[in-house]
């Protein structure tokens, strides 16, 4: 009915995030670097961030960016040492994580735990890397710290099993002296905005790996890119528009089938994950470890991991196996992760790509979203704000901002407690 009355108001407006919180506030070191390079106009006119591209190929700017990233990684270490204990199978804290150093790739997937977001694919890849390193500790030339964070809906059993799998894998691989100098996994518990504000500035790689055609948009991908993380992702949600802005040249880690390809597979029924399992030894070994008690200590854990194995390979309760094509995209994901490693071995080039990604994020500010709503939907014009009124609101907002749960740190990466 509303569409018949106002068809012109039914338009697609891209999501955005505020660069004041998700860059200026949460990453003061990077914000100061940007201001030094291009001035402070970007803070309120985020399209100005495009001017950072002219520094992307500058050696000194690349070096400074990489040093900032290392400092933010150290801030994340300090945060997790106090807020993220190692837990046993009953959930009891039994110690604290030891981390790889700041030269490691920080591989980050932070979002709601859901099958379509495919944390499970990320974890299977971690198992594959672990098996490779067990056979040959020199199989990988970079160090990788994998961080996963998110919450599961209260009644979503499979999502909770994915969290259990994360804990089981991290417990095993982090204690394996043969591999733990090259690979570690941390599940960050009780994920919230305050923790995101410390994780995001430290990220090197942003995992945006949902099954193409399932993500409406997403904003975590924008926050991570604004802070200089490169995206490994499918053509899904806002990844598509980000890819267009960044261009193919600086978006090297695209992988996976498209929405149209996935729709065709579902329509024809031409997908059998069992064939993939049988034809690839590395995948088969990784999946078999979900049911052979390689990672479990209790029967409850064994049952949870066995259920995940079954969901990927066997029809259950009328649902087709591997509904979100985890195995269907896994090999392409694995190959693309090798491209990640190759680029990470060239830090100056990696920094150039990261700075180009930041510079391309102008369209993904919430200011831009609001401007487009005002123009295309609300039909209202911008008006000047009284500076005194603005300052009053800023003070009131600061006084009532109760979301900060971490104490202040020297570099400002961990926020003040209110």
Segments and roles (model prediction):
Residues 2-5, 173-180, 245-247:
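Short, conserved catalytic or adaptor-binding loops enriched in Gly and charged residues
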């Amino acid at each position: 009915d509303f569409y018949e009355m106002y068809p012109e108001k039914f338009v697609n407006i891209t999501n955005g995030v505020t660069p004041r919180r998700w860059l200026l506030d949460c990453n003061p070191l990077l914000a100061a670097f940007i201001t030094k390079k291009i001035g402070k106009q970007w803070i309120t006119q985020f399209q100005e961030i495009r001017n950072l591209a002219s520094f992307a190929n500058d050696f000194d700017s690349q070096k400074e960016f990489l040093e900032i990233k290392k400092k933010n990684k150290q801030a994340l270490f300090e945060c997790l040492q106090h807020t993220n204990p190692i837990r046993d199978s009953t959930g009891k804290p039994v110690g604290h994580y030891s981390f790889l150093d700041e030269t490691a790739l920080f591989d980050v997937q932070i979002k709601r735990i859901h099958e379509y977001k495919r944390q499970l694919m990320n974890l299977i890849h971690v198992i594959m890397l672990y098996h490779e390193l067990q056979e040959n500790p020199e199989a990988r030339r970079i160090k990788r710290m994998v961080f996963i964070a998110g919450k599961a809906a209260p009644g979503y059993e499979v999502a909770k099993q994915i969290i259990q799998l994360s804990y089981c894998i991290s417990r095993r691989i982090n204690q394996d002296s043969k591999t733990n100098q090259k690979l570690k996994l941390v599940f960050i518990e009780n994920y919230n905005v305050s923790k995101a504000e410390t994780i995001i500035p430290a990220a090197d790689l942003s995992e945006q790996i949902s099954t193409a055609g399932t993500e409406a948009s997403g904003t975590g991908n924008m926050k991570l890119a604004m802070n200089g993380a490169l995206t490994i992702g499918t053509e899904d949600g806002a990844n598509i528009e980000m890819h267009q802005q960044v261009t193919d040249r600086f978006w090297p880690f695209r992988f996976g089938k498209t929405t149209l390809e996935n729709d065709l597979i579902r329509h024809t029924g031409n997908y059998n994950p069992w064939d993939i399992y049988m034809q690839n030894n590395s995948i088969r070994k990784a999946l078999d470890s979900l049911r052979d008690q390689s990672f479990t200590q209790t029967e409850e854990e064994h049952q949870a991991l066995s259920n995940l194995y079954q969901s990927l390979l066997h029809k259950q309760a009328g649902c087709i196996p591997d509904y979100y094509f985890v195995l269907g995209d896994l090999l392409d994901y694995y190959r693309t992760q090798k491209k990640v490693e190759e680029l990470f071995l060239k830090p100056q080039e990696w920094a150039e790509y990261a700075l180009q990604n930041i510079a391309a994020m102008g369209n993904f500010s919430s200011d831009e979203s609001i401007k487009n709503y005002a123009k295309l939907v609300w039909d209202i014009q911008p008006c000047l704000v009284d500076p005194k009124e603005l300052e009053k609101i800023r003070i009131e907002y600061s006084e009532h901002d109760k979301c900060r749960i971490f104490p202040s740190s020297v570099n400002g990466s961990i926020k003040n407690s209110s």
